[in-house]
Amino acid sequence: MKSNNEIINIDHNVLIWARKRLNLDINEVAHRIKKKPSIITNWENGKSKPSLSQLETLAYDVYKVPLATFFLPEPPDEPPINQQFRTIPDSEITRLPYKFMLLVKEAQFYQEALKELFDGRNPVDKPIFKSITNLRGGSIQNAATLVRERLTINKEKQSKFKDSTEAFKYYRNILEVNGVFVFQQTLKNYCRGYSLFDTEFPIIIVNSSETTDTGKNFTLFHELSHLLYSMGGISNEYTYQSTNQIEISCNKIASLILVNNNELVQELKEYDIDLNDIKDNQL
C-alpha cells in the first residue's frame, strides 16, 4: 500500500490537462490547495512530483476527477468544450468560470449515463434533432413552424396554460418525448442555460435559479435551435447580444416557436391593435 506522503511518478501533462479543462490558472489551483504557485508550476513542468495525498486533494477537491485519472500514461482524449460552443470565440470560452465548467462536466456525465441506460441509442425512433435539420440557409419561419407542428404547440394549446410554469412543464415533457432530454442546474448568474450536442443524446440545461419560467421557456427553444444546427450553445448576455448569424437565428426561431406571427397578428386585429404601434420589448 502506498503511503500518503509517497511521491508519485505521473505524467505532468495530465496535470496540465486537468487544470485547463476547467479554465483554472496556476494561481487559482495554488490558492485552493494552499500551496505556492511555484509548486504547481514545478509539478506541471515535471521538475517535481506531488505526493499521493496532494494528488487526492487535486482529484477530489479541485479537478473533480477520479484519482486514477492521474495514473494515465497521457491526457484523456476528451473533445475540448469549444467544439460544443462553436458560436462563442475562444477568448470568451476561456473566461467561463470554474464552477460553471464543473457544471458542464456534470452535464456531460448525464449524457454518458443516458448512453449507458439506453445502450447508446436514443429511445425515440425519430427524434426531433434528426427530423428537422439543414437549417443553414433555410427559412427561420419555416423552421419554427416545423418545430411547433412536431411539438404540438399552437394557439389552442398555449391558451390553456394557466401560467408560464405549466407551459414549461409541457414544453419540457414534449421535448423529452421527442428525444431531447432536459435537466435543471443551479447556474446562478453564469447563464440562463446551455445545450450539449450529441448524435444520439443531445441535452438542454436550464437555470433552476430563474425567478420565473418565462425565461426558461425561451431558453429551452433557443437551445433546441442550437441542437437543430447540430451544435451546443450557451444562453447568456454575450450570446443574446452576439452578431453571430447562428445566435441571431436561434433567438428568432425561439421567439417564433413561442409566438406564431400569423396568430399574433390575427389576435391583435381582433382587439383592434395596430402592430406598428407596439414596441419590440412589448411583444
Label every PLM stretch briefly:
Residues M1-L283:
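Short juxta-domain linker segments that transition from a proline/glycine-rich
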